[in-house]
C-alpha cells in the first residue's frame, strides 16, 4: 500500500508502537478479506513512522472489542517526509507512506484464501485523519475541542471507520489492466 499526504506543516507526537495513532495526523488501512463485516484488521501510521495494528473480531457498534496486542507479523512500513517534521519555521510539501503486509500475517483472520485468487474481492477502506493545530514554541500543538478532518476512500455515511459493510471492494486479478489511448485504464 502507498499513500501521499499533502500537508504544509508535517508534525506528530506519538512514537511508541500501539499508541492510539489516530490521536495524531495519520493514514489508516482497514482490511476485511472475506467481506462479512467481522474479523477485520486495522493498521495506522503517523509521520513519525509510529504504528498501531489491531484485530477486531466484530465492529465496535456490534459489541466488538479490539485485540490491541495483535500484530501484523512481518509487516514492513516506511515514511518519507518531503520537508521537515515538527518544525514550524518552514513550509513542507507533505509525507508519503509505504506499507507491505505479508499474506501470512492476515491468513489466520482472513476467512478466505490468503493470498487471494484472481477474481476474489476484499472489503477495504483507507482513511486520512488530520487535526488543526496552533504554533507553539517553534513546533505544533493540536487544538483541543476541534474535531479532526477525515478523508476516506469509500464514503461511510458517518464519521466512523468501523462500519465495514460500507467499505469499498478491491478485486484481485492476475491480468494486466487494459490501457486506452491516453495510457489510462479503461
Task: Identify the residue ranges that each predicted region occupies.
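Structural preference for beta-rich elements and adjacent junctions enriched in aromatics
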Residues: 1-186
Amino acid at each position: 500500500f502507498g499513500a501521499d499526504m499533502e500537508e504544509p506543516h508535517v508534525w506528530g507526537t506519538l512514537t511508541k508502537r500501539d499508541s492510539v495513532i489516530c490521536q495524531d495526523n495519520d493514514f489508516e488501512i482497514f482490511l476485511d478479506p472475506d467481506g462479512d463485516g467481522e474479523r477485520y484488521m486495522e493498521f495506522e501510521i503517523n509521520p513519525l513512522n509510529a504504528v498501531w495494528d489491531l484485530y477486531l473480531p466484530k465492529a465496535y457498534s456490534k459489541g466488538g472489542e479490539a485485540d490491541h496486542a495483535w500484530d501484523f507479523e512481518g509487516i514492513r512500513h516506511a515514511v518519507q517526509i518531503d520537508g521537515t517534521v515538527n518544525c514550524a519555521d518552514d513550509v513542507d510539501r507533505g509525507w508519503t507512506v509505504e506499507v507491505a503486509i505479508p499474506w501470512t500475517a492476515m491468513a489466520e483472520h482472513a476467512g478466505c484464501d490468503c493470498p487471494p485468487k484472481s477474481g476474489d474481492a476484499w472489503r477495504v477502506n483507507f482513511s486520512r485523519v488530520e487535526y488543526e493545530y496552533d504554533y507553539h514554541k517553534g513546533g505544533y500543538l493540536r487544538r483541543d475541542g476541534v474535531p479532526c478532518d477525515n478523508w476516506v476512500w469509500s464514503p461511510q455515511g458517518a464519521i466512523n471507520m468501523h462500519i465495514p459493510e460500507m467499505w469499498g471492494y478491491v478485486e484481485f486479478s492476475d491480468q494486466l489492466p487494459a490501457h486506452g489511448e491516453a495510457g489510462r485504464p479503461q
